[in-house]
Amino acid sequence: MAALLLLSSAARVGVAAPLALRQQRPVVLPGGQLRTGSGAGAASAWAARPLRPELAAVSRPAVPARGRAPLFRPRAWMASSQIASSAFTWGTIAVLPFYTLMVVAPNADVTKRAVDSSAPYVALGILYAYLLYLSWTPDTLRAMFASKYWLPELTGIVRMFASEMTVASAWIHLLAVDLFAARQVYHDGIKNNIETRHSVSLCLLFCPIGIATHVLTKVLAGSIGRSH
């Protein structure tokens, strides 16, 4: 009888052992972690344990962004500060030959042809539009017209000019307007035989003063001519 009991208990142990081993078979998790255990309790306990950050980052596949990348990405070529600095420098250099011709040789044919050309204004206009595109933000109009009457306010303009790109675009705007004003002064001087060298020079950096100087010069020249 005792022998039969021993055999039956051994048979139960022999059957239970493979079952336990099958239930405790390790499972490979994403990221290389192993999970062992048996039953629902072990599965829930392991499910509650998060993966280590470095393994979780490896196990998650990257999701590609939808849509195509833009073909024209100027910011990838140069930094914003480099673009603003280059535009500021080259824009200034581009207008200097026209001022030099109007001051050094106002009556030369090459000066008249150069001043009559529209090329510098087209080039400055394209450069200005490019810088304006780079500096534009959703808050640009709100900063410009911060008043409830939709009028510009000084505080909003000051905030706008905190950006180098905005300053560069404003400088190109001034260069184009100043050169156009200097051309008008030059043409008026040629037409009325009035000296314009000093007025054209002032138009480069102090355009309103240059225009006022030309008007004053024209008045003085007219009064002197009438006296003679």
Swiss-Prot record:
Membrane topology: Multi-pass membrane protein
Transit peptide: 1-41
Keyword Ubl conjugation: no
Keyword annotations: Chloroplast, Membrane, Plastid, Transit peptide, Transmembrane, Transmembrane helix
Tissue and organ expression note: In etiolated seedlings, expressed in roots, coleoptiles and vascular tissues of roots. In root apexes, expressed in quiescent center (QC) and root caps. In field-grown plants, expressed in leaf blades, young stem nodes and the base of axillary buds and adventitious roots derived from the nodes. In reproductive organs, expressed in anthers and pistil of young flowers, lemma of mature flowers and parts of developing grains.
Induction: Induced by ethylene in roots.
Gene Ontology biological process: abscisic acid biosynthetic process; xanthophyll biosynthetic process
One Pfam family per UniProt: ABA4-like
GO cellular component terms listed in the entry, alphabetical order: chloroplast envelope; chloroplast membrane
Protein role: Required for neoxanthin biosynthesis, an intermediary step in abscisic acid (ABA) biosynthesis. Involved in an ABA pathway that acts at or downstream of ethylene receptors and positively regulates root ethylene response. In coleoptiles the MHZ4-dependent ABA pathway acts at or upstream of EIN2 to negatively regulate coleoptile ethylene response.
Note: 'Mao huzi' means cat whiskers in Chinese.
UniProt name for this protein: Protein MAO HUZI 4, chloroplastic
Organism of origin: Oryza sativa subsp. japonica (Rice)
Gene: MHZ4
